[in-house]
């Protein structure tokens, strides 16, 4: 959906099957709505920088394999569809994929030797999403370049994810400009076609590529796994766009950190390299070589490598978010348990966390630069400042509150608005000398917050201090203990 002939595209949901004897809503999905909320949290950015949602909705099908039309299915599915649409993205999400649409087309026709890079690139991102990397927005490389050339601020509140751009391309220029102006960028994939200028920007150089079974060394916070998996990465050059050919160029550069390395015998390659310069106004770029941790074993699709036996190369993308201030980690019993899949989208100034939890024994741990996310209607235990959640099988949860507090149980909940000129009230409790950041609705004209006041909440509002350090429109309140009621 990054490039379309016009603005039309389709969302189709699988309720019944007219050929095979199954009704997916009832059996395959088990009446869980993850395949509604996750795709409906996804959006594209057009050439004008606008968010574009699906224009058409279809169902396959309204009748089951026997021609029956049980009322239960539409009665249960339609509310989820309406909720998903009501909270669909209205701005780019936390993470935006700059999809190389034109580049892939040109490689296929003019540089067929690079087709393996196309195959690798899509598989690597697919695996990262399945690992829990919370990306929800896509823009084509052509539209990205156009918007940047026009000076649009479309991506100012997002982290970008891109392939290594071709030498001398306009995309190369605009990606560097984005970082130098304070943006955060992930670059992944083979670097052999990059310019010297871009390699210097990343502070890497290319050497002899290696592939095979390599021992990994991480300087990244990773998931907590009771029975750890392997630290051996299987990098198949055929499935990963070639071998691993990158090392740091200038190891004395104080702005460069090597976050992950791969070792094959006495050969070492730097597979995750982060760089940041003072002149970049907080900008940061992280290069990941990226491994497609999957093997062809016959059939239509690759088979993911067993995490109990092999290191999952796609996990490095999520782990590297930690160094950009976004900590998303899982606590699980063993490596082979499937990770939760997450999307983080934005609507009406809120953050929406949509997801699927294949195994509910897994605990999710979250921390953003602005604090621990406190979902509306949830309680969470804060440990070392991080929010800990055991999520349901499928979910779409609103987050308007972030709390900086080391320990404790914090909750966020709806409070009846009661008054005629109040749209909404939410409460936040369990605070202990906390810094609280609240994202009210887009219309915050009458926003106010009271501390430790019961109904009718007529105590004067705390001083409203609009924050500027982080994404979005939010208000910051410091040294708060007890309960806050936010009103707008």
PLM-predicted stretches and their roles:
Residues 99, 217-222, 244-249, 272-276, ...:
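Exposed, low-structure sequence patches enriched in small/polar residues
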Residues 16-20, 63-68, 101-109, 164-171, ...:
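Short acidic, S/G/P-rich loop/turn micro-motifs used as interaction or catalytic elements
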Residues 254-272:
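Short, Gly/Ser/Thr-enriched beta-strand-loop segments that form substrate-interacting elements
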Residues 115-205, 360-361:
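Helical hinge/lid and interdomain linker segments adjacent to catalytic or ligand-binding clefts
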Residues 44-50, 63-155, 348:
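Aromatic-Pro/Gly-enriched surface loop or interdomain linker
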Residues 170-247:
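A glycine-rich, often tryptophan-bearing local segment used as a flexible ligand/cofactor-contacting loop or short
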Residues 27-94, 266-488:
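Extracellular ligand-binding/catalytic regions of CAZymes and related secreted enzymes
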């Amino acid at each position: 959906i990054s490039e379309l002939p016009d603005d039309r595209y389709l969302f189709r949901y699988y309720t019944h099957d007219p050929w095979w004897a199954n009704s997916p809503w009832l059996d395959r999905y088990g009446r869980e709505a993850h395949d509604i909320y996750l795709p409906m949290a996804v959006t594209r950015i057009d050439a004008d920088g606008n968010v574009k949602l699906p224009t058409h909705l279809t169902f396959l099908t309204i009748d089951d394999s026997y021609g029956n039309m049980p009322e239960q299915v539409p009665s249960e599915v339609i509310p989820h569809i309406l909720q998903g649409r009501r909270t669909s993205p209205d701005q780019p999400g936390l993470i935006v994929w700059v999809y190389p649409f034109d580049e892939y087309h040109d490689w296929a026709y003019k540089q067929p030797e690079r087709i393996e890079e196309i195959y690798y690139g899509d598989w690597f991102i697919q695996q990262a999403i399945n690992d829990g990397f919370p990306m929800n927005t896509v823009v084509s490389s052509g539209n990205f370049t156009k918007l940047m050339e026009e000076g649009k601020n479309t991506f100012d509140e997002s982290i970008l994810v891109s392939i290594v751009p071709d030498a001398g391309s306009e995309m190369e220029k605009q990606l560097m400009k984005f970082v130098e102006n304070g943006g955060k960028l992930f670059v992944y994939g083979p670097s052999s076609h990059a310019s010297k200028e871009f390699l210097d920007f990343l502070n890497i150089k290319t050497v002899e590529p290696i592939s095979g079974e390599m021992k990994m060394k991480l300087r990244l916070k990773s998931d907590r796994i009771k029975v750890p998996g392997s630290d051996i990465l299987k990098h198949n050059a055929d499935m990963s766009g070639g071998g691993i050919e990158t090392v740091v160029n200038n190891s004395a550069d104080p702005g460069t950190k090597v976050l992950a390395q791969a070792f094959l015998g006495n050969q070492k390659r730097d597979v995750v390299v982060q760089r940041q310069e003072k002149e970049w106004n907080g900008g940061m770029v992280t290069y990941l070589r990226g491994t497609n941790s999957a093997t062809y074993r016959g059939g239509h699709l690759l088979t993911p490598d067993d995490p109990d036996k092999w290191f999952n190369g796609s996990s490095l993308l999520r782990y590297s978010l930690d160094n950009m201030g976004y900590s998303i980690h899982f606590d699980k019993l063993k490596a082979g348990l499937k990770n939760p899949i997450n999307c983080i989208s934005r609507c009406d100034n809120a953050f929406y966390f949509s997801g699927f939890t294949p195994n509910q024994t897994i605990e999710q741990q979250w921390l953003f630069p602005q604090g621990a996310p406190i979902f509306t209607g949830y309680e969470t235990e804060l440990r070392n400042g991080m929010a800990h959640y055991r999520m349901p099988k499928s979910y779409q949860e609103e987050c308007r509150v972030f709390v900086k507090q080391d320990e404790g149980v914090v909750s966020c909940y709806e409070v009846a608005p009661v008054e005629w000129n109040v749209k909404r009230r939410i409460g936040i409790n369990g605070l202990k000398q906390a810094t609280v950041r609240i994202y009210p609705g887009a219309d915050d004209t009458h926003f106010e917050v009271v501390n430790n006041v019961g109904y009718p909440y007529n105590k004067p509002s705390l001083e409203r201090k609009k924050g500027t350090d982080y994404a979005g429109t939010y208000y910051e309140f410091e040294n708060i203990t007890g309960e806050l009621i936010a009103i707008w």
